[in-house]
C-alpha cells in the first residue's frame, strides 16, 4: 500500500523541480549578482517584432542605461525614464504619461529582462545548455501578465543575457537581442531625474 504514496511523493518533487529548476536558478542568480554589483550599466539592444504568422512587424534600436532600480531608455525620439518610483514615458512629440513602478508590473520591459531578478515573478526551467550558453524558459506566476512565456539565451562565460524571446497571449513574438553591454559605465545620478526643461514648451503630462 506504500507504493502509491511513493509515486505521489515522486511527482510532487518533480512538479516542484519544474517550477523552480535549481540548475536554471544557478545561472539566473549569476546574472542577477552581476547586475546588483554594478554601479552603472549601458546596453545597446535590438528588438524585432513578429506577428503570430511569423511576419516581421518592425525592428527597433534601443539604448538603455541602468543604475540600481533606476533606468533611462531611448528609442529614436521616444524616451522612458524611471527614477525608481515613477515611470515617465515620452512619446517623442509633446506628451508624457506617468505611472508608478507598481502599475507597470503587467508588462516586461528590457530593464526587467536584464535585471536578472526572476525569482519573484517566474517559474523557470533549463531547456538546454552547452559549455558557453544556456537556454532557459520563464513562465510568469501572475497569469494576468500580458505575455505567456519568455525564452532566454544566456552567455554562461560572461554571466549575461544574450537574447530573450517574448511570446504574448496573441502568439505575437518579440526578440530582444543584446548587441553590447557595459557593466562598468559611469552614469550621473541626474540622468535618472525628470527634468521638465528638456522637453517642448507645449508638453502635456498625464497621470
Where are the predicted features?
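Short, exposed beta-strand/loop patches in secreted or surface proteins that constitute
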Residues: 34, 62-65, 79-80, 124-129
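Short beta-strand-initiation
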Residues: 59, 68, 75, 119, ...
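Residues embedded in well-ordered secondary-structure elements
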Residues: 5-7, 32, 53, 62, ...
Amino acid at each position: 500500500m506504500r507504493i502509491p504514496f511513493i509515486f505521489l511523493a515522486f511527482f510532487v518533487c518533480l512538479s516542484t523541480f519544474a517550477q523552480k529548476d535549481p540548475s536554471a536558478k544557478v545561472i539566473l542568480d549569476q546574472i542577477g549578482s552581476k547586475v546588483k554589483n554594478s554601479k552603472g550599466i549601458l546596453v545597446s539592444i535590438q528588438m524585432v517584432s513578429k506577428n503570430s504568422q511569423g511576419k516581421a512587424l518592425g525592428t527597433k534600436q534601443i539604448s538603455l542605461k541602468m543604475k540600481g532600480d533606476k533606468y533611462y531608455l531611448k528609442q529614436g525620439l521616444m524616451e522612458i525614464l524611471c527614477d525608481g518610483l515613477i515611470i515617465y514615458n515620452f512619446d517623442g512629440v509633446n506628451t508624457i504619461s506617468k505611472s508608478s513602478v507598481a502599475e507597470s508590473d503587467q508588462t516586461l520591459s528590457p530593464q526587467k529582462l536584464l535585471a536578472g531578478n526572476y525569482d519573484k515573478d517566474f517559474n523557470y526551467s533549463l531547456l538546454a545548455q552547452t559549455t558557453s550558453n544556456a537556454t532557459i524558459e520563464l513562465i510568469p506566476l501572475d497569469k494576468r501578465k500580458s505575455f505567456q512565456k519568455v525564452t532566454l539565451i544566456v552567455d554562461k562565460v560572461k554571466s549575461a543575457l544574450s537574447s530573450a524571446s517574448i511570446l504574448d497571449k496573441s502568439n505575437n513574438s518579440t526578440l530582444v537581442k543584446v548587441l553590447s553591454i557595459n557593466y562598468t559605465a559611469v552614469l550621473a545620478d541626474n540622468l535618472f531625474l525628470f527634468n521638465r526643461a528638456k522637453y517642448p514648451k507645449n508638453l502635456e503630462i498625464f497621470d
